[in-house]
Amino acid sequence: MPQPMIARRTLLAAAGLLAARGAFAQTADGRVQVRIATDHGDILAALEVAKAPVTCANFLRYVDSGRYDGSSFYRATRAPGAPTVGLIEGGIDDPRKLYPPIAHESTLMTGLKHRDGTLSMAREGLGTATSDFFICSGETSYLDANPSAPGDNAGYAAFGQVVQGMDVVRAILALPTTGVARDPAMQGQILDPPARIVSMRREG
């Protein structure tokens, strides 16, 4: 876990980065909108910059630098017997394009929840998230932090919500998952072919 002083400096740096970008792309409620253009259609997401400042600043850093352009949604997980429930995961495959990992902002810290259309950061251990993120389809509250659960119970860092384009999310979720997995635990979850992310841009 990050030390309090490190976390405080990270929060200050994130707030400064967001302020430097200006408020032109913010909605009336202070959220920042990002359009994710894919080869299956567009997804419009609203980022909760006030509630998840570290996570949103990291995501917007990749957006503003163009590093998500040409990346892909490469993974789809579907609940057994409920093919429209699950998530699609995307990110950057080239390690040279990755920024340093960020501190984990749990749902207990942000007050955000994993529900239909939630954007959240993929991770391994705490403080390992870089570019990979996922979009939820259907009820996914099991991804929230749960202090009473055994083991790693910090959940995932929710940071935004799809406001348009859930039909695109579900179309990608339904694509064939016959690709070869690097991790055996992901076998049967790798999109073949992946859904290309053409570009990501702030909207407004």
State where each predicted segment sits:
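Cyclophilin-like peptidyl-prolyl cis-trans isomerases
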Residues: 2-6, 12-204
